[in-house]
Swiss-Prot record:
Entry-linked Pfam families: KOW, ribosomal_L24
GO biological process: translation
Subunit structure: Part of the 50S ribosomal subunit.
NCBIfam families referenced in this protein's UniProt entry, alphabetically: rplX_bact (TIGR01079)
CC annotations in GO: ribonucleoprotein complex; ribosome
Domain of life of the organism encoding this protein: Bacteria
Protein name: Large ribosomal subunit protein uL24
Lineage: Bacteria, Pseudomonadati, Pseudomonadota, Alphaproteobacteria, Rickettsiales
Length: 105
């Protein structure tokens, strides 16, 4: 499955309990025909960790993965969500925002 969102992109959550939150993509997993993304500060859950030699135990907040269909690319300059397209610039394929025409790569 082709996903037009990559690590480092600004995205907005468009469905679920965190709808409307904006964050940066930390990690993308593409396995088994399923694409999920981890977004900084979104879809937080609490995880209990036992103490070990290396670190202290306790309850920590960690980010869960979100399905790629529940997020959309966010244009930080215009302040709106937008779609991404591909075009050739100087013989090189680049991603661009369809709303503003700004080149991402």
């Amino acid at each position: 499955m082709m996903a037009k969102i990559v690590s480092g992109d600004d995205v907005i959550v468009i469905a679920g309990s965190d709808k409307g939150k904006i964050g940066k993509v930390v990690k993308i997993l593409r396995k088994g025909g399923h694409v999920v993304a981890k977004v900084a500060g979104v879809a937080l859950c609490r995880k209990s960790v036992k103490p070990s030699k290396d670190r202290e135990g306790g309850i920590f907040s960690v980010e869960r993965f979100i399905d790629i269909s529940n997020i959309a690319l966010f244009d930080s300059e215009a302040g709106v969500r937008t779609k991404v397209g591909y075009k050739f610039v100087d013989g090189k394929k680049v991603r661009y925002l369809k709303g503003s025409g700004r080149v991402l790569d």
